[in-house]
């Protein structure tokens, strides 16, 4: 395939006067006017991936011949029937006829032969085609997502002026772009804007736009599966098929507002929802006379009660002239919508500040749509630091507090259960404010002190803060003088670098307090005797007194040891742990052994330790097993239910079904008898226009306009002399031959 340089469709004299200045195509044909043999991928060094769309994958590369940076786009073949993608053929055919500085041009074509193990693989493994275009350092999505870039009004005017000039040239050549969005608008380091991705572009029939005369076209029906939903105009949402050049101006209006907001303004989840938010912004469809005649009545009816909010929404971020231009671009009636010539003559471009020249534009950091996630993380990080940064200096002590940073608790993180990633410790945060003295500055007191009635902080603290301080003091007293708490942030860092095992080994050598020399932590066998309740020891007449003294001594050691147990959980969690009748926190063993006042708890067999005078029969305990209970059939309860409790063999059998949770079962039974009547949610009808942007269903064969495109693409006599043309014809013949032979088999 070859591209003939300088080939244009004949135009009338009245069309030339609306053309903007153009630049020559950067293609060097041979003496016969043909481009030489197509390049190979090995002629380029791929650097990185720039993005991926519906019709191809774009990569940044460097030419090995001259060292220039280029963008290589792989043409994806969606249909196995096509030897060459029809969308790529249409894009190349249209770009061959466009020659403007604000339109992206094709420099080269690449063809890669398929790697086949046998001759039949050509049916599934065809050669790959690539287009080579000049490398553009940024696209509009990347610039708007980059937190380091803030567009000024003069820069916005320069971008909009170039965009309108480019789309005006496209419309004067009688083409519809049909996919205007921020991702398809590219900006180079020289400040020149280029419109890209003509995969959905089509020729239109009718008059070209004139100044003050509305849009052009509207004489032929097209598919409605065009334009990305967030930039889709209301006429396509309502089912119009004979649309005009106004569909591109609606997308430009959305991009114009996005330059001020930094994000898309009309983000719909479906076509019905998209139509609703459009009507909420620009007003009810009742103001548009022909809207009621369009086929999509569901989208029409959802906006009847909507009121216009465009001016109120953008009044605080856009000047008056910009709002007036935006209102003209986002007009419901496409025949009243501004065309490109009308927009270029708007007073927005003639008021101060004037639009910058492309050479005056700054050299922005390289920003593409693929960098969107990276920019989002960077933006969230900066926002978190700015929100948590205190207004005055920070005392670099993990336990210092002040009324100016009272939103952060003593232990790091937010107060009242609010999780934050900020800690006022020196290792986590460095403040750059210069310290300055204040008259009301005070020395931070230690956490064991009681609240002083003369403390000025009491005037600025809430009840939640005071309650937190009392809880901290109580936790400090319960710790027995030894601070074994590790801040959460430090613990997290230790776990990241060395894991939880090294953290636990760090405290293995800690010894209990108030224990005689040579004594160690109680063994598991001694813990079993400690777990016996006081009532059980008294009930054994043959038990010697020495055993009771030993058990009381061991109980005392354990109670002292509990206070020095290495516990890295926050003091708030320790405060919520259950305690015994003496206020001591319970461990897993002590919790199991703690008797209740009104109910006796039987001792497990494996924890009992036989003593002198106590027989084996007395220590025996009935074997416990799970019991299946038969439950009467009910609407809410199954016939057979497995009991979750353990039932002794000596217990009495009961015919009454045991219900583990009567409240839940009662609710279930009540709900089964009288089910609540839930309001029905309105169903959103999904029409054919809900599909993604595609034009393949109606153009899957070479009939109708596609045949005209192909004939126009291949009919030139000079084109047939090209070796690229011969390569495509040969591959097509091989495919038809092998495909026909494969079917006959």
UniProtKB/Swiss-Prot annotation:
The keyword Nucleus applies. It is an enzyme of class 2 (transferase). Residues 380-406, 428-475, 493-508, 547-557, 599-631 have a biased composition (Basic and acidic residues). SUPFAM superfamilies: Protein kinase-like (PK-like) (SSF56112). Its main location: nucleus. The active site is at 179 (proton acceptor). Residues 558-567, 586-598, 661-674 have a biased composition (Polar residues). This is Serine/threonine-protein kinase BUR1. It comes from Candida albicans (strain SC5314 / ATCC MYA-2876). The gene is CRK1.
């Amino acid at each position: 395939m070859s591209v003939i340089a300088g080939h244009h469709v004949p135009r009338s004299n009245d069309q030339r006067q609306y053309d903007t200045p153009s630049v020559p195509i950067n293609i060097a044909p041979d003496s016969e006017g043909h481009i030489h043999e197509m390049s190979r991928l090995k002629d380029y060094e791929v650097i990185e991936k720039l993005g991926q769309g519906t019709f191809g994958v774009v990569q940044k590369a460097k030419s090995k011949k001259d060292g220039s940076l280029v963008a290589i786009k792989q043409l994806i073949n969606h249909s196995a029937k096509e030897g060459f993608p029809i969308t790529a053929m249409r894009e190349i055919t249209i770009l061959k006829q466009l020659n403007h500085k604000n339109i992206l041009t094709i420099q080269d074509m690449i063809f890669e032969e398929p790697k086949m193990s046998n001759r039949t693989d050509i049916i599934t493994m065809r050669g790959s085609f690539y287009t080579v275009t000049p490398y553009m350092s940024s696209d509009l999505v990347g610039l708007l997502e980059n937190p380091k870039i803030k567009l000024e009004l003069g820069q916005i005017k320069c971008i909009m002026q170039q965009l309108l000039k480019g789309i005006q040239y496209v419309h004067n050549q009688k083409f519809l772009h049909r996919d205007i969005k921020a991702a398809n608008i590219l900006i180079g380091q020289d400040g020149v804007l280029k419109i890209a991705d003509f995969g959905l572009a089509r020729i239109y029939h009718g008059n070209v736009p004139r100044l003050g005369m509305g849009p052009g076209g509207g004489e032929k029906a097209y598919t409605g599966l065009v334009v990305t939903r967030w930039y889709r105009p209301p006429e396509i949402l309502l089912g119009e098929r004979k649309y005009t050049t106004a569909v591109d101006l609606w997308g430009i209006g959305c991009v114009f507002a996005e330059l001020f907001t930094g994000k898309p303004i009309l983000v719909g989840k479906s076509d019905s929802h998209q139509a609703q938010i459009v009507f909420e912004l620009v007003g009810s469809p009742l103001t548009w006379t022909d809207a009621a005649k369009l086929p999509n009545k569901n989208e029409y009816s959802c906006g009847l009660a909507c009121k216009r909010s465009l001016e109120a929404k953008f009044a605080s971020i856009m000047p008056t002239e910009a709002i007036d231009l935006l209102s003209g671009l986002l007009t419901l009636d496409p025949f009243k919508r501004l065309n490109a010539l009308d927009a270029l003559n708007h007073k927005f471009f003639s008021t101060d500040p004037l639009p910058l020249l492309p050479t005056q534009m700054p050299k922005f950091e390289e920003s593409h749509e693929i960098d969107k996630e990276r920019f989002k993380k960077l933006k969230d990080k900066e926002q978190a630091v700015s929100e948590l940064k205190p207004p005055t200096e920070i005392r670099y002590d993990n336990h210092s507090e002040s009324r100016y940073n009272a939103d952060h608790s003593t232990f790091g993180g937010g107060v009242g259960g609010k999780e934050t990633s900020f800690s006022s410790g020196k290792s986590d945060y460095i403040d750059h404010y210069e310290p300055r003295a204040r008259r009301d500055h005070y020395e931070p007191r230690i956490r064991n002190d009681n609240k002083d009635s003369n403390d000025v902080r009491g005037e600025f603290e809430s009840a939640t803060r005071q309650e937190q301080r009392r809880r901290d003091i109580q936790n400090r007293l319960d710790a027995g003088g030894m601070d074994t708490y590790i801040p959460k942030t430090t613990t997290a860092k230790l776990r990241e670098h060395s894991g939880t095992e090294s953290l636990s080994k760090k405290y293995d050598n800690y010894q209990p307090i108030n224990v005689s020399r040579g004594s160690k932590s109680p063994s598991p066998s001694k813990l079993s005797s400690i777990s016996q309740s006081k009532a059980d020891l008294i009930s054994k007449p043959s038990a010697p007194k020495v055993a009771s003294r030993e058990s009381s001594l061991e109980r005392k050691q354990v109670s002292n040891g509990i206070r020095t147990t290495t516990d890295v959980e926050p003091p708030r969690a320790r405060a919520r742990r259950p305690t015994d009748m003496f206020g001591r926190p319970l461990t897993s063993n002590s919790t199991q052994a703690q008797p209740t006042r009104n109910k006796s708890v039987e001792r497990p067999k494996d924890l009992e330790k036989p003593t002198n005078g106590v027989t084996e029969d007395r220590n025996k305990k009935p074997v416990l097993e799970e019991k299946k209970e038969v439950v009467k059939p009910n609407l809410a309860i199954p016939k057979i239910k497995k009991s979750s409790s353990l039932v002794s063999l000596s217990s009495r059998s009961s015919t009454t079904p045991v219900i583990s949770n009567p409240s839940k079962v009662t609710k279930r039974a009540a709900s089964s008898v009288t089910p609540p009547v839930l309001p029905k949610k309105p169903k959103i009808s999904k029409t054919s226009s809900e599909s993604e942007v595609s034009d393949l269903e109606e153009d899957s064969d070479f009939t109708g306009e596609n045949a005209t495109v192909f004939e126009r693409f291949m009919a030139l006599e000079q084109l047939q002399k090209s070796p690229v043309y011969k390569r495509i014809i040969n591959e097509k013949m091989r495919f038809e031959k092998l495909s026909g032979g494969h079917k006959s088999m």
